[in-house]
């Protein structure tokens, strides 16, 4: 085989016999390709092991034939826009090994995973609390309310919840996990769904209120955002209970 043919071969599945043949090939180009292949395989094996370890909490419920939903939120800190939550029930054979804490993933990777999670999950639901609700009952309670809405929106009722550092106000057994999106694939999937949903929503708000640069700041208090607040005052989606938004009321 030519070097190009071997390179193409090593991009897919390779049998043990083929690998042995290639290892016996003394061409430097072939040996260099083999080194790269083995590095990729080692990296994949490590990622797969980490992915499988993030199902340890789910397996405790699966072993009892119970459905478990991961629940997470995004958007507690911004000065504008809603807090968005998601609840996700994953099947036992879920195999998207790139699913991880959404904060560890690039926007491009999150957007790519979003439709795949929707396709492979048993059920996905999103809940949100807008800025008016946040101003009325505070961000913590609004977050809990949105989580409850997300869980209630699932097409099948879970037997238990895995929740990232919160308690959901529902009569369902729950496991609260600090940094849960890095410990549970179900919570990680929920974090990706919530993040992409909110980012897309803030992009739409960016079209509606272009002066505030919501497409790039997602409602957080960047310099451009603060300058727009000072110049134009708050929009209908700003959280008046958050300092310093109220200071800029016109």
UniProtKB/Swiss-Prot annotation:
Signal peptide: none annotated. Manganese or magnesium. Binds 1 divalent metal ion per monomer in the absence of substrate. May bind a second metal ion after substrate binding. The keyword Cytoplasm applies. It is found in: Cytoplasm. CDD domains: RNase_HII_bacteria_HII_like. A divalent metal cation binds at residues 72-73, 164. GO terms for biological process: DNA replication, removal of RNA primer; mismatch repair. Pfam families: RNase_HII (PF01351). Its main location: cytoplasm. Endonuclease that specifically degrades the RNA of RNA-DNA hybrids. Belongs to the RNase HII family. This is Ribonuclease HII. It comes from Lactobacillus johnsonii (strain CNCM I-12250 / La1 / NCC 533).
